[in-house]
Design a protein with these regions (language model features):
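N-terminal export/assembly segments and adjacent metallocofactor-ligating motifs
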Residues: 1-240, 254, 269, 277, ...
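Active-site phosphate/pyrophosphate-binding segments
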Residues: 233, 251-374
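Extended redox/cofactor-interaction regions of prokaryotic respiratory oxidoreductases
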Residues: 116-192, 199-204, 228-231, 317-431, ...
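Long, contiguous, secondary-structure-rich segments that constitute the structural scaffold
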Residues: 467-554, 636-654, 658-759
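Acidic/polar loop patches that form or flank catalytic/metal-binding clefts of enzymes
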Residues: 30, 131, 244-245, 281, ...
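Glycine/threonine-rich phosphate-binding loop and adjacent beta-strand/alpha-helix elements that clamp
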Residues: 443-470, 480-485, 490
Length: 759
């Protein structure tokens, strides 16, 4: 019998970055446990961690490429697959030009070094403006507000949960999400610690979520009105002279404009809009201002709504007004060991962030951070004319489940001339592909959370080497992406990928040696490249990024600093300390100051103000739809693993008892939910955890499409809530509106199923 060995690695399935101890017997995964010695998670783990074993054993996980022949996806060699890509992609590019090909990058890409480090070369080789990602059905409003205020899209202040005394949470459920735009394992333990040290946790949410149940208090709020509430809190702080930004006042522009914008949003003006009494709003404001250390934190419920950017902006306005921005126990800027733009070069001045540099062809929606709103992808495919999308590349994404008006996108994708997907499953989206290129399983890939450490409450660095060898003939994921780039660049399926990898690292080195303030400023690029040795691929890039990062050894400048070699010798990670104040150096705005009221955001305030006098969604008696997170799900990509779908049906319509009685709904019965975009039927769950007038359906389900090859997911199909989502967007960011959707709800008398979209 083979000897058992234990491998330590970071879990790649959510933002918490928990350390795991994976016991192997040869190629068999024996067990997955929490790593008690991990410097960040200290043994904490959640059920998703078991996905490492179950994904390894999943017979539906693709291990060989698929090519469409005679209408069917069949196994092919890697050479045949790339030849098919070269022919199909080349044809679309040749006939329609660069913008005829669109790219969609899904959420799992953020957890994998291949897409994180090599996605940019692919996008540059394609040269298309039709770039889409899960960001515009998720966090884009926060990136836009942070970028415009502080100068970089990932300069997102995160709550210093380990040192705060008062945490106000809106539209977030970190006990289930494990923290989002907030990397901090064991959020339950961290929130409990706030209360144990005499602090307070306040949750504002249309659902009494698991986090709300652990909080000191919970307030229901009408979906989509968070910005009204936040403005009212700002109004109280200013009117009662409770605002005290402290040292940050000398680093900020337009404080007077913020006061002017907040003036109409009195507690009395907004109480009917948001459903929270004026006296309660005043108390929330006074307690926030009175706490020794306080932070405001908001997440997906506030970003996937009509006023997502305004709500995201106002969170940081409140942190500023209360003197808690960039302060211990407040909301602070993380300092990552690698790949963080706001820690490279010299602050506080920089180029800042521009949005709307180009517009989508059909609806004229503006670009954000180099991509277009995915809510417009269907119309870009379906609408004839110059620049019509005729080809699609998807990487680790399932947009036919994850994006709004999914029915329209499903119809549009069927008309494409060519589609290629990098994915481990034939799912609702990839079943339409002409070529599917499987990525290796997580245990066969190196791992470093280059993206998520930029949002972590402590500066942590943890490298995970591959546990398993790649199957014979299987390329690395980064090699697959580079070969797609070479094909897009016209070099064909047999291009020299090693040369592409060299180009990537040489570009990074060249940029860094020319960067004022870099530890290798002015050094010889050849010397730096030689110092990286024989490493290739992500290992070489991460080694380089860590060495030139804020804790790095700087290629000899600080012999005690970090390198990949040091990380390899530290299997439980290296803790580099808590967050620290970083203003003004963290700023990258052209002014070198905090822009408290960016014009792009201030211009959207009249739209919000108009709702003070109007009726607003949900104020006329109609039902309003919201989503919900689930601990054993991560969007649409964990549902083929038995351990994560076992138990009772989780894809239900949650409804308040008063509404259930009025609508004639029964526990365990079926409800038909319809919107302007579509209709579905799902099981009813009656609970007083939901606000009256609101219904909730989790996202990421609906796995009953013909052609899917995910047997477990199909047996627990659920319904796709995005059939109900319109193509409406938050104006400044282009983010989809997935919460606060007006719907009609009625009893149904048929089995739970997704019904064809009506739009």
């Amino acid at each position: 019998m083979a000897t058992e060995t234990v491998h330590y690695r970071t879990c790649p399935f959510c933002e918490a970055t928990c350390g795991l101890a994976v016991t192997m017997r040869g190629d068999e995964v024996v067990s997955v446990r929490g790593d008690a010695d991990d410097v960040f998670s200290r043994g904490f783990l959640c059920p998703k961690s078991q996905g490492l074993k179950q994904l390894h054993d999943d017979p539906d996980r693709l291990t060989k490429p698929l090519v469409r022949r005679n209408g069917e996806l069949v196994e092919a060699s890697w050479e045949e697959a790339f030849e098919a890509v070269a022919e199909g992609l080349g044809r679309v590019l040749g006939e329609g030009g660069r913008d005829a090909v669109a790219v969609y990058i899904g959420n799992p890409a953020a957890h994998s070094l291949g897409p994180v480090l090599y996605g940019t070369p692919l996008l540059k080789a394609l040269g298309t403006k039709n770039i889409y990602s899960a960001s515009t059905v998720d966090q884009m409003p926060k990136q836009v507000s942070a970028g415009l205020m502080f100068g970089a899209g990932l300069s997102v202040p995160v709550p210093d949960v380990d040192r705060t005394d008062h945490l106000l949470i809106l539209g977030a459920n970190p006990l289930v999400s494990n923290g989002s735009l907030l990397t901090a394992p064991d959020m339950r333990g961290r929130l409990r610690a706030i209360r144990e040290r005499g602090g307070k946790v306040v949750v504002v949410d249309p659902r009494r979520s698991r986090t709300a149940k652990e909080a000191s208090e919970h307030h229901f709020i009408r979906p989509g009105t968070d910005a009204h509430l936040l403005f009212a809190i700002a109004n109280v702080l200013l009117a009662e002279q409770l605002a005290d930004p402290g040292r940050l006042a000398e680093h900020a522009n337009d404080a007077e404009l913020v006061a002017e914008l907040a003036e109409p949003f009195t507690p009395e003006a907004v109480e009917a809009v948001c459903g929270i009494a004026a006296d309660e709003i005043r108390r929330l404001a006074r307690e926030l201002a009175g706490a020794a250390h306080a932070a405001v934190y908001a997440r997906i419920g506030t970003t996937t709504q009509r006023f997502g950017t305004l709500a995201s902006w106002l969170v940081d306005v409140l942190n500023y007004l209360t003197g808690n921005l960039d302060r211990e126990g407040g909301a602070m800027f993380p300092l990552a060991a690698a790949a963080q733009r706001n820690s490279s070069g010299r602050g506080p001045t920089g180029k800042g962030v521009r949005v709307g540099r180009w517009q989508s062809r059909v609806s004229g929606r503006g670009e954000v951070f180099g991509e277009l709103p995915v809510a417009g992808l269907a119309e870009e495919i379906a609408t004839p004319g110059d620049g019509q999308v005729r080809g699609l590349i998807t990487i680790a994404g399932n947009p036919l489940v994850s994006t709004p008006d999914s029915g329209a996108l499903a119809e549009a994708v069927e008309t494409l001339e060519f589609m290629v997907s990098v994915d481990i499953y034939v799912n609702e989206t990839t079943r339409h592909a002409d070529v599917v290129l499987p990525a290796p399983e997580p245990l066969a890939k190196a791992h470093y959370d280059a993206a998520l450490y930029q949002l972590a409450v402590r500066s942590v660095a943890n490298w995970s080497a591959p546990v398993l060898e790649l199957p014979e003939g299987q390329p690395h994921e980064w090699e697959v992406i580079l070969r797609l780039a070479a094909i897009a660049a016209g070099q064909g399926p047999d291009a020299d990928i090693e040369a592409w990898d060299e180009l990537v690292i040489q570009t990074l080195i060249g940029r860094e040696v020319a960067l004022p303030g870099s530890p290798i400023e002015g050094r010889d690029p050849a010397e730096i490249a030689a110092a990286l040795g024989e490493r290739r691929g992500p290992e070489r890039i991460i080694d380089f990024m860590v060495r030139v990062g804020p804790f790095g050894e700087g290629f000899g400048a600080d012999p005690e600093g970090l390198s990949l070699e040091r990380l390899e010798a530290s299997p439980h990670g290296i803790d580099l300390g808590p967050m620290r104040p970083r203003i003004p150096d963290v700023l990258r705005t052209p002014s070198g100051r905090i822009e408290l009221a960016p014009p792009e955001i201030a211009a959207d305030v009249p739209r919000l103000r108009a709702e003070l006098a109007g009726e607003g969604i949900g104020r006329n008696g109609e039902m309003v739809l919201i989503g919900r997170r689930q601990l054993r799900s991560n969007n649409s990509w964990m549902h083929n693993l038995p351990a994560l779908v076992k138990g009772k049906d989780r894809c239900t319509v949650q409804v308040h008892p008063d509404d259930a009685e009025r609508l004639g709904l029964a526990e365990g019965g079926r409800a038909r939910v319809s919107s302007a975009s579509g209709e579905l039927v799902a099981p009813v769950e009656i609970t007083d955890e939901i606000m009256p007038g609101v219904v909730s359906i989790p996202h990421g389900w609906g796995h009953d499409a013909p052609g899917n090859r995910m047997a477990v997911a199909a047996a627990h199909a659920g319904v796709n809530s995005n059939l109900l989502a319109p193509v409406d967007v938050d104006v400044p960011s282009g983010n989809a509106v997935l919460n606060g959707i007006p719907v009609e709800v009625a009893a149904a008398d048929r089995e739970p199923e997704a019904v064809a979209a009506t739009a």
